[in-house]
Amino acid sequence: GSFAYSNLSGRLQWGAQAFSQTQFFFTPGYSLYSSFDFLTRDQAVATQTMRGATVFGIYPISRFRRLELSAGFYHSSENFDDPSVQTANEAFLSNEFGVELFRDGLFAPLTATYVQETTIFREFGPLAGNTVRISFTESPKLGNTLSQRSVDADARYYFRLGDTGLLAFRARGFKSWGDYPDFTFFGGNSEMRGYEYLEFIGHKAFFANVELRFPLV
């Protein structure tokens, strides 16, 4: 859940929010030990719980473009749903690589984002225009906080065909680095059709697709 306050009275919009949220994702299906089989999809389910607060500001450059700035402080906890898999994973990574897959600690992220939105919508979804979102996040090392940097870019273009048809283009790139780099995960109907939901995960990722869309009714 979350609690938020927003002030939209001026051109510079600002606000703050406190949150506690848990989401699930699928970890890579690697072998924990040489005697183990690869993780099944059910065994690879993990959860990420984040609790903290952020302050943010939104400044419109024009009708279709804006800048967003935010600063926050939160605690992140990640773990496998299956405790036996969690124990085996920690032992394997510690013995083989001396690293941890999951991040557990405090972060103090500072984020700057550019957003462009000219998309025209109909009752069935986007029809024409484009959407661009580019963000950079810096989580510095402050005392016992964990450090990371991330860049995330998402661009979409909708080319109208007739009254209701369109070609939809999308490209997205993500990269995170530092002592405790962030993950991105994607896959499924909304991003990569034909693949399992959230099938892909990593610190670096890129995908692009083109779709021909037209409503049947």
Please describe what each predicted stretch is.
Residues Q17, Q23-F24, G29-A46, V55-F56, ...:
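C-terminal outer-membrane beta-barrel translocator/porin domains of Gram-negative envelope proteins
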Residues G1-S20:
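Predominantly transmembrane beta-strands of Gram-negative outer membrane beta-barrel pores used
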Residues S9, R65, S77, T118, ...:
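Conserved NTP-handling cores and scaffolds of large molecular machines
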Residues Q13, R66-S70, L166-A168:
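Membrane-spanning beta-strand positions in outer-membrane beta-barrel proteins
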Residues G1, S62, F80-D82:
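Interface/linker segment at the passenger-translocator junction
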Residues S76-E78, F174:
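Short, solvent-exposed aromatic-acidic interface loops
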Residues T49, I58-S76, A128-E138:
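Face-selective signature of the C-terminal outer-membrane beta-barrel domain
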